[in-house]
């Protein structure tokens, strides 16, 4: 950087991304710098825009489901959960109790997947490589649970309107239970390595600070909001599935900085493990999808002897089901915050309009206020603490 005649560094405008290892996706930031200090950030989005909301209007309600796996591809089951809840509200459909338990189990496993990746990458952005190697080994085990249940490691399409695609295979719940028993040891190791580490604290404490009022004004949700000291969690405030009968705490921070966001996510991982233990202990037997054959397909073995089952199967996968005219909004406490789906139905087999509320969009818009006055080296840490994925931001 060249110096001006009076000895001060000239203001400079630089590009951060869209191809940058710390950008967490195809993000382009226009930085206005004064020396090493950030004076202004202009985020440019849309580089991963695929027109998801418009594409959904041309698909049946079942065909639209896989699009939600591809939004926040780090935590896919949370999004298909929100979509399924929204369609079920329009249909007036009740889901069997076992399906509700399994939905919560996989949504909490999804929370583990998301928060583990975030902690690992935030540490990597700060210069710590060891947690990444430890954590990715455990994430692979969770992804294997995904694969055994749905056949896919990422894009599962497992949670569907009316219940689940299928029941879990024998032995899977036992393996998840075993995982919840030994996993806290790894979490303790990561905790010991990072939480009181002086370099980690220097890189995160008082960096990217947000006040309670700013968080509310920007529309924050999830760990970003709770790190500011506001205990808002949809699983507690607007319970869905079986969260109203589960015992868990809502971790909150106090300073609203990068360090508090890290602490909140680590605490949420432990709470998710506690929720998993309760679900695995209490889960009942029974069906995992509604018995309304106009919504959920019959079992495969029924097709061999029942003409009626064959007709239902053919109609569901060729034409789909018609959803009563109306509109509905459903939101879930996704790992990144409040993920909402708003659907308008015109009484046909395809949505008239589908609007998606992604938490990362609200968080990214605050990056200018969060990073202003900080050094350039602090920017990757702030981006890491935001926990953004551009599949859901650009849609």
Curated annotation (Swiss-Prot):
GO MF annotations in UniProt: NAD binding; NADH:ubiquinone reductase (non-electrogenic) activity; quinone binding
GO cellular component, one term: plasma membrane
SUPFAM superfamilies assigned: HydB/Nqo4-like
Localization per record: Cell inner membrane
Membrane disposition: Peripheral membrane protein
KW Cell inner membrane (keyword) present: yes
Record-linked Pfam families: Complex1_49kDa
EC number: 7.1.1.-
Catalytic reactions of this protein: a quinone + NADH + 5 H(+)(in) = a quinol + NAD(+) + 4 H(+)(out)
Keywords assigned by UniProt, alphabetized: Cell inner membrane, Cell membrane, Membrane, NAD, Quinone, Translocase, Transport, Ubiquinone
Signal peptide range in chain numbering: none
Enzyme class, first EC level, given as a word: translocase
Family of the protein in this entry: Belongs to the complex I 49 kDa subunit family.
Role summary: NDH-1 shuttles electrons from NADH, via FMN and iron-sulfur (Fe-S) centers, to quinones in the respiratory chain. The immediate electron acceptor for the enzyme in this species is believed to be ubiquinone. Couples the redox reaction to proton translocation (for every two electrons transferred, four hydrogen ions are translocated across the cytoplasmic membrane), and thus conserves the redox energy in a proton gradient.
NCBIfam families in the record: NuoD, PRK06075.1
HAMAP family membership: NDH1_NuoD
Assembly behavior: NDH-1 is composed of 14 different subunits. Subunits NuoB, C, D, E, F, and G constitute the peripheral sector of the complex.
PANTHER family in the cross-refs: NADH DEHYDROGENASE [UBIQUINONE] IRON-SULFUR PROTEIN 2, MITOCHONDRIAL, NADH-UBIQUINONE OXIDOREDUCTASE 49 KDA SUBUNIT
Protein name: NADH-quinone oxidoreductase subunit D
